[in-house]
Amino acid sequence: MSKEKFERTKPHVNVGTIGHVDHGKTTLTAAITTVLAKTYGGSARAFDQIDNAPEEKARGITINTSHVEYDTPARHYAHVDCPGHADYVKNMITGAAQMDGAILVVAATDGPMPQTREHILLGRQVGVPYIIVFLNKCDMVDDEELLELVEMEVRELLSQYDFPGDDTPVIRGSALKALEGDAEWEAKIIELAEALDSYIPQPERAIDRPFLLPIEDVFSISGRGTVVTGRVERGIVKVGEEVEIVGIIDTIKTTCTGVEMFRKLLDEGRAGENVGVLLRGTKRDDVQRGQVLAKPGSIKPHTKFESEVYILSKDEGGRHTPFFKGYRPQFYFRTIDVTGTIELPEGVEMVMPGDNVNMVVNLIAPIAMDDGLRFAIREGGRTVGAGVVAKVIE
C-alpha cells in the first residue's frame, strides 16, 4: 500500500488522553492509532513506542509527553499522552500541549478515582473545552448494572465541575481487546473516533480571533511617529484601523497608520508575523513593553485573578524551599514581569517545590488578560513556576 501524503486540507484538531494511572490511557492511544490506521489508512503506533515518552522542556519545566497523529475521514488529529500524573499536571498548566478536547479514560473495573477527579478539575481550570468519556476494560465487567453505575458516577463528576455530564458522549470499550484485533471492540474505537468528530467543534483559528499584539519594543521615528514591534498573537491589523493600547496604565485609543515587516510596508499584519506597527499621534512615552495592541474592546486590563499554578521542583531548577502566604514573586505575562501577592486556598499554609496549587493573585499593575492566559512565576529573572489564569476577578 502506498504511503498517504500529509493532507493540509483536512481540519486539524488537538486532543489528548486524561485519567487515573493504570486505567488504560496509553493502551487506548495505541488502540486508536492501530484501529484507525487499519480502517482509514495512516500509521499505527505500538504501546511501547508511546509509553517511552521523550522528555521535553516547556518554560524550563521537564515534561514527558508522547505525540501521535491519526486521521478520520473528516479530520486530522494530533494526540498527546503522558506517562505520569505529574506530567499531566505540568502539561495542562503550561499549555505545552493545548487541547481542543480530551478523552477521559475511566476503568469500568475501578470507577472514578482521585486522579480522575483531579484531571477533570484541571481541565476546567485550564480551559479544556470538551471532554469525551471512554469507559475502558468493559470486557472484564459482566454486570450491566455495574457499568450503568460507573457511567452515572462519571457523569455526576463531570457535572460537578461544570461540564455537561448528562450530554457527554460515553463510549464503553476495551482498549486492550481492540488492540488485539477483536472486531467487537474495534468497533468501539471507531465509535470513539466518530464522537471526536461530532462532539468537538472545529477550533477557532488564531487568525479569526480579535487582533492582539504583545508589545516587545517601542521606537520613535522622527517625522513618522511611534512604532511598536512584536509578534501578532491573533487576528489581523489593517492600516487605517483603530486599535487600543492596553495594560499597565490607562487604555489609550490610537490608529494604525502603517505596518512593516523586514523594512517592507504592508497593508496588514497577520497572526504569527513579526511586525512593526506605526501609531498615529502616539507619544513614545505613552507606550511601553508589556502592554498589548488590540482590537478596541476585545481585551481589558486586570489585576486580580484566580489561577492554577505548578511550582518547579528543585531538580528542575526551581526553589529549594517552600513558600508561604505573603510570598511576592514576579508574574511574567507575555513580555513583562509584574510583582504580585498571593492568597492560598483555605487550609493550605505552604507550597512545596513540585506541587500544583490553586491561588488568587493580586498584581501591582493591571495586565491585559483573558481566562486561559499562561504566565511564568519568577524570582529575579529565574523561573520558579508556571501558571494559567483560571478566572479573572477584577
Swiss-Prot record:
Domain of life: Bacteria
Region (G2): 60-64
Annotated spans, G4: 136-139
GO molecular function: GTP binding; GTPase activity; guanosine tetraphosphate binding; translation elongation factor activity
Domain tr-type G: 10-204
Subcellular localization(s) per the UniProt record: Cytoplasm
Top class in the EC scheme: hydrolase
Protein family membership: Belongs to the TRAFAC class translation factor GTPase superfamily. Classic translation factor GTPase family. EF-Tu/EF-1A subfamily.
PANTHER family with a match to the protein in the record: ELONGATION FACTOR TU, MITOCHONDRIAL, ELONGATION FACTOR TU-RELATED
UniProt-recorded name of the protein: Elongation factor Tu 1
